[in-house]
Amino acid sequence: YATLLPAEVGYLHVDTEAVIAIAQDGEQLAKLREMRDGFEFFDKPYDASQVKLQHIIVMNAEGLEPADDWESLADLEARGSEQLEATADERQRRANDQQRDDTATYTYTSGTTGPPKGVVQTSGNMLSMLESAEKCGVINQDMKAGGLFLFLPLAHSFGRLIELSGPYFNTPIVIAGIPT
């Protein structure tokens, strides 16, 4: 969530050992920079060596001073476009190597009774969710043809279902622009 404090962001990064972060804007970039130097969360100190973050991508970099610790989404897209053909075989190999029991994502509890607890969701879990949504009619032909409207945060399991439905069912998704 955009409202998370730097220590909360840091905790999630340490817990998942994430090496790449995508920040919406300068405000979120500042949180990543702050937690990178270490933080305290639920009275437990975390030092910089525990933060594995190596690369930050900023989606809306307008007004930000260039720096070595982040890259704009536009620059990443340009760099990626230049390498599409050269990396096609490697990307296909990686896609083919994916197994249903591979980790796909983490979903966290709210943390109301202590530090948030991460739930590992596998590729198989996500695929089963999509297959079941279609089978029981949660995602039907009309929705596939007309598109889906996503208003839930991507930290929410149903929000993730809608997010993944776009590429899985080859259907458009409209994402609400209201911060959550």
Where are these regions (language model features)?
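Conserved pre-ATP/AMP-binding loop-to-beta segment of ANL
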Residues: 78-108, 115, 140-147
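Hydrophobic/aromatic ligand-binding patch that stacks against planar heteroaromatic rings
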Residues: 12, 108, 164-166
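Short glycine/serine/threonine/alanine-rich loop segments
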Residues: 18, 115, 171
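Structural core segment of the AMP-binding/adenylate-forming
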Residues: 1-79
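Short coil-to-helix segment of the ABC ATPase nucleotide-binding domain corresponding to the Q-loop/switch region
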Residues: 122-123
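Conserved AMP-binding/adenylation subdomain of ANL enzymes
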Residues: 127-150, 154-180
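Active-site beta-alpha turn of Rossmann-fold NAD(P)-dependent dehydrogenases/reductases
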Residues: 107-110, 152
